[in-house]
From Swiss-Prot:
Late-budding domains (L domains) are short sequence motifs essential for viral particle budding. They recruit proteins of the host ESCRT machinery (Endosomal Sorting Complex Required for Transport) or ESCRT-associated proteins. p6-gag contains two L domains: a PTAP/PSAP motif, which interacts with the UEV domain of TSG101 and a LYPX(n)L motif which interacts with PDCD6IP/AIP1. The gene is gag. GO terms for molecular function: RNA binding; structural molecule activity; zinc ion binding. PROSITE patterns: ZF_CCHC (PS50158). Residues 8-43 are annotated as: Interaction with host CALM1. This is Gag polyprotein. It comes from Human immunodeficiency virus type 1 group M subtype A (isolate U455). The lineage of its organism: Viruses, Riboviria, Pararnavirae, Artverviricota, Revtraviricetes. Residues 14-33 are annotated as: Interaction with membrane phosphatidylinositol 4,5-bisphosphate and RNA.
């Protein structure tokens, strides 16, 4: 404890033990608070020896302050303790922790105003990563570990998907070739992809050397040499030379040129990691239109084509590769429809509501077809009539009226319409009276006589005259038989 408590001694220790923890409270700071602060700094991988000086306390405050909004109570207590200790080192008279925090805030505001005033006096902004020093000279500021960590995390999570390219562009804005090489070197995996990227960079560097040959003769005094392809790639140039080219008059943006080469190589890598062609993106039968559009544009980002070609793909393939339901809707909108109009029109296609509507339309068409098939003598469609209620326009199976009892044809009970014999005709067109025996198109059950009647031989009966016999034959209706129909048919003999 002695080594940890040796941060303060003498008058500084007396001043430390007079400061209260809270305004109006009884508890005051003791040596145990210094011991606790040293242990907490070790947990945050900070050097406890920084507590011995005011500059060290200021560095600790700068590291802890960004995490105060989301930090724990222990982190806030550590920040408060270091703030009070800084006031003790600077011999700033404070009575409690709150007053010390106010002093720290005032000091930070003054420093911020001084920095802004200095930037205004120099007349130039401090653009990252090349900033102006106190003498107004451009100096290089290396990429922060947070930026490098964000880049590595994107590569590990996305595995060179299309969104890696805009992320790289955002993180490498204004970077020097040395910064760009650092971003490429921190990528641990995907070495095959990184080798492809190096090959692309070498090809572009060779093309640069071919288009920008070296001028013969010595370099004039005060001027810089022209950058070669390897200089732009950062392999044969120093940071000072890169800054000189980027800030010269006229400037040579070696950082932007190198970044453009890297993006070109990343496009090839993304194309390799995304083997699906835009021509293969088709909407599934039950896939929502929104998900289909998301897959379409994600694949479109990986296509190696100009913006005009991508616009043509969007206007043509987006409609052409949609499912039949969405395609009919999109074609009805016309060629000038926007994506918002397409998304709105196809919203809900494939869902329960759309399925029910399509099923209802299909059933309506089937019912209409069955109605059209009910024709009279093939003269055209006619209105159907319900056998239950007698009204036109619907069938008996769809009738809402109470079910009618008995036969729908004759109105009598005891049988159904299919068994009704009321005015039923045979194929000869003759009405079959159900109460007069069998129909005439059936073979007659009465056998034909083989001998003449008894009246002819005069067995006690009186002979009838031919006139009376003819009148009797006229009154008696002849029976219809198949024999009378077919005449001398040999099969009927």
């Amino acid at each position: 404890m002695g080594a940890r408590a040796s941060v303060l001694s003498g008058k500084k220790l007396d001043s430390w033990e007079k400061i209260r923890l809270r305004p109006g409270g009884n508890k005051k700071y003791r040596l145990k608070h210094l011991v606790w602060a040293s242990r907490e700094l070790e947990k945050f991988t900070l050097n406890p020896g920084l507590l011995e000086t005011a500059e060290g306390c200021q560095q600790i405050l700068g590291q802890l302050q960004p995490a105060l909004q989301t930090g724990t109570e222990e982190l806030r207590s550590l920040y408060n303790t270091v703030a009070v200790l800084y006031c003790v080192h600077q011999r700033i008279d404070v009575k409690d922790t709150k007053e010390a925090l106010n002093k720290i805030e005032e000091m930070q505001n003054k420093n911020k105003q001084r920095t802004q005033q200095a930037a205004a006096n120099t007349g130039s902004s401090q653009n990252y990563p090349i900033v102006q020093n106190a003498q107004g000279q451009p100096v290089h500021q290396a990429l922060s570990p947070r930026t490098l960590n964000a880049w590595v995390k994107v590569v590990e999570d996305k595995a060179f998907s299309p969104e890696v390219i805009p992320m790289f562009s955002a993180l490498s804005e204004g970077a020097t070739p040395q910064d760009l090489n650092m971003m490429l070197n921190v990528v641990g995996g995907h070495q095959a992809a990184m080798q492809m990227l190096k090959d692309t960079i070498n090809e572009e560097a060779a093309e640069w050397d071919r288009l920008h040959p070296v001028h013969a003769g010595p370099i004039p005094p005060g001027q810089m040499r022209e950058p070669r392809g390897s200089d732009i790639a950062g392999t044969t140039s120093t940071v000072q030379e890169q800054i000189g080219w980027m800030t010269g008059n006229p400037p040579i943006p070696v950082g932007d040129i190198y970044r453009r080469w890297i993006i070109l190589g990343l496009n090839k890598i993304v194309r390799m990691y995304s083997p699906v062609s835009i021509l293969d993106i088709r909407q599934g039968p039950k896939e929502p239109f929104r998900d289909y559009v998301d897959r379409f544009f994600k694949t479109l980002r990986a296509e190696q084509a100009t913006q005009d070609v991508k616009n043509w793909m969007t206007e043509t393939l987006l409609v052409q590769n949609a499912n039949p339901d969405c395609k009919s809707i999109l074609r009805a909108l016309g060629p000038g429809a926007t994506l918002e109009e397409m998304m709105t029109a196809c919203q809900g296609v494939g869902g329960p509501g759309h399925k029910a509507r399509v099923l209802a339309e299909a059933m309506s068409q089937v019912q209409q077809t069955s109605i059209m098939m009910q024709r009279g003598n093939f003269r055209g469609p006619r209105r159907i009539k319900c056998f239950n209620c007698g009204k036109e326009g619907h069938l008996a199976k769809n009738c809402r009226a109470p079910r009618k009892k008995g036969c729908w044809k004759c109105g009598k009970e005891g049988h159904q319409m299919k068994d009704c014999t009321e005015r039923q005709a045979n194929f000869l067109g003759k009405i079959w009276p159900s109460n007069k025996g069998r129909p005439g198109n059936f073979p007659q059950s009465r056998p034909e006589p083989t001998a003449p009647p008894a009246e002819i031989f005069g067995m006690g009966e009186k002979m009838t005259s031919p006139a009376k016999q003819e009148l009797k034959d006229r009154e008696q209706t002849p029976l219809v038989s198949l024999k009378s129909l077919f005449g001398n048919d040999p099969l009927s003999q």
